[in-house]
Regions:
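Protein kinase catalytic-loop region centered on the HRD/HxD motif
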Residues: 57-67
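AlphaC helix of the protein kinase catalytic domain
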Residues: 32-43
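Activation-segment/catalytic-loop signature of the eukaryotic protein kinase fold
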Residues: 12
């Protein structure tokens, strides 16, 4: 895919029964590792906006090709040498046919599953935007998930209720809180 915000894939091959993917080098790691390095502290709001918008632009490009990513998470958002976000790991992405508007297979990482996926309903690119909302929350809380539980069943119930702790008071703009609410 030819986008400044989608990681480039060059090749893949099997070796010893394992799939190896050759992709663009991302020298500045992943958003997940960056959040871990923050040691529980939120990113500054200007960085949150930058990374969120760049990830959104990458997803817009993916969606324009009728592809649903299906595994949007901080571990799959990489940084290039200029600290631009690159949407990566489209290994479980779903290409929709021209006549198809929704996918049905449940895949992805539990913390990032949209309510539609939790309810085993058809879903579309809005599920990717929902997962990006989870990433947005992580950036604002130093890596915390908006929906957390001791087991998958309890996690799914929390996701379906849609109730999460508000962002730290006074730390982020009302616009950012509004965008988060629109995503989740």
């Amino acid at each position: 895919m030819d986008s400044k915000y989608v990681i480039k894939y060059y090749d893949c091959f099997l070796e010893d029964g394992k799939l190896n993917i050759v992709m663009q080098y991302a020298p500045n790691g992943t958003l997940h590792s960056r959040l871990h390095a923050q040691r529980g502290k939120a990113l500054p709001e200007d960085k949150v906006w930058q990374f969120f918008i760049q990830a959104l632009l990458g997803l817009r490009h993916v969606h324009s090709k009728k592809i649903i990513h299906r595994d949007v998470k901080s571990l799959n958002l990489f940084f290039d040498q200029d600290d631009n976000v690159l949407v990566g790991d489209l290994g479980i992405a779903k290409v929709l046919s021209p006549n198809t508007m929704f996918a049905r297979t449940i895949v992805g990482t539990p913390y990032y599953l949209s309510p539609e996926l939790c309810e085993d309903k058809p879903y579309n690119e809005k599920s990717d935007v929902w997962a990006l909302g989870v990433v947005l929350y992580e950036m604002c809380t130093g890596g915390k998930h908006p929906f957390d539980a001791q087991n998958e069943g309890a996690l799914i119930r929390k996701i379906m209720k849609g109730v999460y702790a508000p962002l730290p008071g006074g730390k982020f703009s009302s616009q950012l809180s509004d965008v988060l609410r629109a995503c989740l």
